[in-house]
Amino acid sequence: QHALEKGEECNAVALTRKGEILYSYKRGAKLVTWDHQVVWDYKTPDKTELQSATLLQNGGVLLGICGVPAQFIELDKKGKEVNKVTLNLEVERPHSQFRQIFQLRNSNYLIPVMAKQKVLEVSRKGKIIAEYQIEGKAFSSLELPDGNLLLPCGDNHCYIVIDRKTGEELKRVNALDIEGVALLFVGQILQLKNGNLLICNWYGHTKDATVDEPQLIEIDKNGKVVWSLHDKKNVGKISAACYIDNFRLPNLK
């Protein structure tokens, strides 16, 4: 367990090939070892928020900094800046801009702009390749095997799938569509090796104290729940997750 400091919030977490932990904490992003040693700490200036820290295909890191303008910065494995894109998202309040930014298989960036209810595909040189208007404030994104985009829509209590070529909405799963659970704030959604989806069901904006739902929900291809984590006492709110397969903890002795 690695504790966040007071005032920090983590909306992105990943495990590197070396077994180090990458996470964002709003005022920056850190890469730490399993025994809490800081490899690097990238701090962001005042009036900005570093909400996204995700892995690139080459093992580097993509940072997403909310601000005017927004910044998307690539770091190499040693934490050195190797590419930077600045973009005016036309959203003055940094906290309303985005949460998770991922690199697509074609090396472009996918940027869900919450306040504008749209998703941008942007090249590494800062050119807008595609723009999708959606019905929902997307927290994150998942590039599916067929190239289409799955978008978790936060406080809209749903996730959608859109056609990558046309932007058409192909599927929408609403709050009560999954038998046995209810979707609250839909955070990151991951696809596991078996094709199942793992949904982060964040409850931070839930106003009704009687609402009690799992923090993590795994569903199969038919939309049936096959596993869930329901332990608010020991775990708390979950907006982001990292799927670890065949990983062994390093010897810390």
Language-model features: locations:
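Histidine-/acidic-rich catalytic cores in large beta-rich domains
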Residues: 1-253
